[in-house]
Design a protein with these regions (language model features):
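Short loop/turn segments at beta->alpha junctions
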Residues: 103, 118, 228, 271-274, ...
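ABC-family P-loop ATPase nucleotide-binding domain
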Residues: 1-24, 309-325
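Short acidic-hydrophobic catalytic motif
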Residues: 230-234
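A generic structural signal for short beta-strands and their flanking turns/coil linkers
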Residues: 87, 236-238
């Protein structure tokens, strides 16, 4: 847990920490954000999912006021001019960058000072953060001597040191090994429990499935789905895998018409009436049930159905490249 960070009092704005309506942003002939509506509830963990090039980074930068939309409007912590709220926001950009000669604790304090935190207090908090996360040995090390993952952790701490009400993270898990990814997930949950709103982008679906209360699936600059992960999964029917000793008989008429048969097993969507009526007919028809499993769809399955197989393959490829790096 980050030291000296009390739970936040209720914010003086509406129920949404971030809102965007009808947002459009083009670069020449390329429309990176194409008519997006988004609302991030206060205190929530909200994930923007999509492959590289989907428009995630441009959307975050537009919401933060780093770039202005060509059309539409946005509010950040209740203010229609987002940059005025910069001191209450922690932002980790996709492009990482720290001064290589600066010591780790100084880099964190410096980023806090840019957000209005007194330098002496920033140094105190920086040392406490590093020590509290088992990185006390890195306090006085220059950035150039740190591993890539440790340097990224330092930049993340610089995003958090001034106790922002809103944290925006662009691909925060990129470049981290599995252990540091788990630590980052724990840190995100910790901040959310303190009342901080977390908005992050990712092309790794598993992180969103574990962390997010709400998600937006983005492809081609548009939001293809917005809601809870459960709502995304509920768009798909559960799948049944059945194996029988008998290969034929009157009982087969009870199987759904779209059943796929393969080597004595049957694969079909869970019937609307549930599995019990079908089981009765199979038992009475002496099908000889050897095994039966019901597979609930995951968020990856929902992503494929919503954004398309090409977008899912691009997401998977990017994740595999990171794992191999």
């Amino acid at each position: 847990m980050i030291a000296d960070t009390p739970a936040l009092t209720p914010a003086p704005y509406s129920g949404y920490a971030v809102e965007g309506h009808g947002l459009v942003k083009s670069f020449g002939a390329f429309r990176a954000v194409d008519g997006i509506d988004i609302a991030v509830p206060v205190g929530s963990i909200y994930g923007v999912l999509g492959p590289n090039g989907a428009g995630k980074t441009t959307l975050l930068r537009t919401l933060l006021g780093i770039v202005d939309p060509d059309e539409g409007h946005r509010t950040l912590l209740g203010d229609a001019r987002p940059l005025r709220m910069a001191r209450q926001v922690g932002y980790l950009p996709e492009e990482r960058g720290l001064y290589p000669s600066m010591k780790a604790f100084e880099a964190i304090a410096f980023m806090g000072a840019l957000r209005g935190l007194p330098l002496a207090e920033g140094r105190r908090r920086a040392k406490a953060m590093l020590e509290g996360h088992g990185l006390g040995g890195a306090i006085d090390k220059p950035i150039r001597q740190l591993s890539k993952g440790m340097a990224q952790t330092v930049q993340l701490f610089g995003t958090l040191v001034h106790d922002p009400r809103l944290i925006v993270l662009d691909e925060p898990f990129s470049g981290l090994d599995a252990i540091n990814q788990e630590k980052l997930e724990a840190l995100i949950r910790d901040r959310a429990r303190a009342g901080v709103t977390i908005l992050f982008s990712t092309h790794v679906i598993a992180h969103a499935e574990r962390l997010c209360e709400r998600i937006a699936i983005v492809a081609g600059g548009r939001i293809r789905f917005e809601g809870t992960p459960a709502q995304a999964r509920d768009r798909l029917r559960s799948q049944v895998r059945l194996r029988t000793r008998a290969s034929d008989g009157a009982w087969r008429r009870a199987l759904p018409v779209d059943t796929l048969a393969q080597d004595g097993s049957w694969h079909f969507a869970l019937p609307d009436g549930g599995i019990e009526p079908l089981l009765r007919e199979l038992i009475e028809g002496h099908a000889g049930i050897e095994s039966l499993s019901i597979e609930r769809p995951g968020l990856h399955d929902a992503f494929v159905a919503i954004a398309g197989a090409d977008a899912a393959r691009a997401m998977d490829a990017a994740g595999n490249e990171e794992a191999a790096a």
